[in-house]
């Protein structure tokens, strides 16, 4: 089952993975994503961790609670999906950079 696997490299691979994860997490924190809804009446910004940084609402929506709620939900969902998609892309890059896990070819 473990034929061709070099266990002596496992520590090295894990250390590399840890370093890559820390670097990619720092990279993610510095990213900002933005989404708009209602033709720009509502805009939302979030960072790579999915934390909402800013919400801007056009004054014309302040008296239309139902529309405001719908547009806020839409913009927030969009920006959080962007952050999540970026996390998945970063994870894919990290896993791709781990090499052959010590398998001898």
Swiss-Prot record:
Gene Ontology CC: bacterial nucleoid; cytoplasm
Molecular function per GO: DNA binding
Keywords noted in UniProt: Cytoplasm, DNA-binding
One Pfam family of this chain: YbaB_DNA_bd
Cytoplasm listed as a keyword: yes
Protein known as: Nucleoid-associated protein Ccur92_18190
Quaternary structure note: Homodimer.
Annotated family: Belongs to the YbaB/EbfC family.
Subcellular location: Cytoplasm, Nucleoid
Purpose: Binds to DNA and alters its conformation. May be involved in regulation of gene expression, nucleoid organization and DNA protection.
Keyword Cytoplasm: yes
Organism superkingdom: Bacteria
Major location category of this protein: cytoplasm
HAMAP family: DNA_YbaB_EbfC
Lineage: Bacteria, Pseudomonadati, Campylobacterota, Epsilonproteobacteria, Campylobacterales
